[in-house]
């Protein structure tokens, strides 16, 4: 009980950290420095709570915390349930559109671009996610967009993630507009909502590593590195925003639309918090 209270106090302090950072009058604000301070505190929290876990292992979720669960997961990864989805995603990525182009025409580096997303588009003044870029490519070439949460969008995303494994998370926040989006995502992460009056941080910081019913709560650090995921509960592969919607439903809150500004800003914040880790998707989860 005492440790839970201490965790709660610490997460509350993280919420206030940026607002309390002194900014010299009339001086140009170094937004990246403010964000880097958040990252240091956020990652420091988890490294203190789980001193035996290497930083890079947080991308493996609960399997970094529980040895029995890790063994079961490794056995499952020997014959990954998402393997066929990756193959299907590759075919879709290279399939010609009616105009002769393809998704491959829109992405550099042969499609190994997971490390480029999400990013803040300074011209459009909004966060752009990988799934958003996939559908924008299709629409720009006269094709219909994929449905957002599962199916072909998740398969293409899984293929791109698979050929991008090992790329380092390094999301930049350079401007006031980018910082505003980051702060919206941060506020979403720490805000309580729904019938259960819970927050993302309440589950995945204060209760990280503990059991809720029969499940172990995953740590927030590394949450975005391994998506899309094949969840046993779903019986299929799905996107990060599908998982966000599921979390909202679990606490009795109305989900936002997939790829809404709210969820894109949340993804932006969460990915920034994982700066320094490596992308390791797609992955399998319960």
From Swiss-Prot:
Its EC number is 2.8.5.2. The gene is soxA. C-type monoheme cytochrome, which is part of the SoxAX cytochrome complex involved in sulfur oxidation. The SoxAX complex catalyzes the formation of a heterodisulfide bond between the conserved cysteine residue on a sulfur carrier SoxYZ complex subunit SoxY and thiosulfate or other inorganic sulfur substrates. This leads to the liberation of two electrons, which may be transferred from the SoxAX complex to another cytochrome c and which then may be used for reductive CO(2) fixation. This is L-cysteine S-thiosulfotransferase subunit SoxA. GO terms for biological process: sulfur oxidation. GO terms for cellular component: cytochrome complex; periplasmic space. Residues 180-286 form the Cytochrome c domain. Disulfide bonds join 106-137. Cysteine persulfide at Cys-247. The active site is at 247 (cysteine persulfide intermediate). Its cofactor is heme. Optimum pH is 6.0-6.5. Heterodimer of SoxA and SoxX. The SoxAX complex interacts with CT1020, SoxAX-binding protein SaxB (SoxK); this interaction seems to be between SoxA and CT1020 and stimulates catalytic activity of the SoxAX complex. It catalyses: L-cysteinyl-[SoxY protein] + thiosulfate + 2 Fe(III)-[cytochrome c] = S-sulfosulfanyl-L-cysteinyl-[SoxY protein] + 2 Fe(II)-[cytochrome c] + 2 H(+); S-sulfanyl-L-cysteinyl-[SoxY protein] + thiosulfate + 2 Fe(III)-[cytochrome c] = S-(2-sulfodisulfanyl)-L-cysteinyl-[SoxY protein] + 2 Fe(II)-[cytochrome c] + 2 H(+). Keywords: Disulfide bond, Electron transport, Heme, Iron, Metal-binding, Periplasm, Signal, Transferase, Transport. Belongs to the SoxA family. Heme binds at residues 200, 204, 247. Optimum temperature is 55-60 degrees Celsius. It is an enzyme of class 2 (transferase). GO terms for molecular function: electron transfer activity; heme binding; iron ion binding; metal ion binding; oxidoreductase activity; oxidoreductase activity, acting on a sulfur group of donors, cytochrome as acceptor; protein heterodimerization activity; thiosulfate-cyanide sulfurtransferase activity. Substrate binds at residue 243. The lineage of its organism: Bacteria, Pseudomonadati, Chlorobiota, Chlorobiia, Chlorobiales. Residues 1-27 form the signal peptide. Its main location: periplasm. Binds 1 heme group per subunit.
